């Protein structure tokens, strides 16, 4: 099948298939949201998410690394994020908190992923799960954080 036909077929379905990494991020976001709202251990949250229909389609290792990594480093990540905010961290919605923690973790701990890809993925999550203009806020905060955490990478792009 030609490329154009494949693209048309995808467009005809209405949605493109999500990558395994994107699904891993979405499930990690669900877990982080649950943690923000109700608490719980990483192991308990992971066990619940492993029982979902979407789980076998995800990058399971990456999901686990994200969920456990963010939860273990949440206080440090919050300190990194706070100077980039226009209000106290605890005044953000649980969705924004979860997305920003996830984005900050990827910026800090996964230098193999380009900073623009990390920000784009976070913005897409905010568009799908956040408030009306939440994606703009997430974009602005993570842009500021990327300048701090990925200065060499950003400098090389200029």
Curated annotation (Swiss-Prot):
<comment type="function">
    <text>Involved in transcription antitermination. Required for transcription of ribosomal RNA (rRNA) genes. Binds specifically to the boxA antiterminator sequence of the ribosomal RNA (rrn) operons.</text>
</comment>
<feature type="compositionally biased region" description="Basic and acidic residues">
    <location>
        <begin position="1"/>
        <end position="12"/>
    </location>
</feature>
<dbReference type="Pfam" id="PF01029">
    <property type="entry name" value="NusB"/>
</dbReference>
<dbReference type="InterPro" id="IPR006027">
    <property type="entry name" value="NusB_RsmB_TIM44"/>
</dbReference>
<comment type="similarity">
    <text>Belongs to the NusB family.</text>
</comment>
<dbReference type="InterPro" id="IPR035926">
    <property type="entry name" value="NusB-like_sf"/>
</dbReference>
<dbReference type="GO" id="GO:0003723">
    <property type="term" value="F:RNA binding"/>
</dbReference>
<keyword id="KW-0889">Transcription antitermination</keyword>
<keyword id="KW-0694">RNA-binding</keyword>
<dbReference type="GO" id="GO:0031564">
    <property type="term" value="P:transcription antitermination"/>
</dbReference>
<feature type="region of interest" description="Disordered">
    <location>
        <begin position="1"/>
        <end position="20"/>
    </location>
</feature>
<protein>
    <recommendedName>
        <fullName>Transcription antitermination protein NusB</fullName>
    </recommendedName>
</protein>
<keyword id="KW-0804">Transcription</keyword>
<dbReference type="GO" id="GO:0006353">
    <property type="term" value="P:DNA-templated transcription termination"/>
</dbReference>
<dbReference type="GO" id="GO:0005829">
    <property type="term" value="C:cytosol"/>
</dbReference>
<dbReference type="InterPro" id="IPR011605">
    <property type="entry name" value="NusB_fam"/>
</dbReference>
<keyword id="KW-0805">Transcription regulation</keyword>
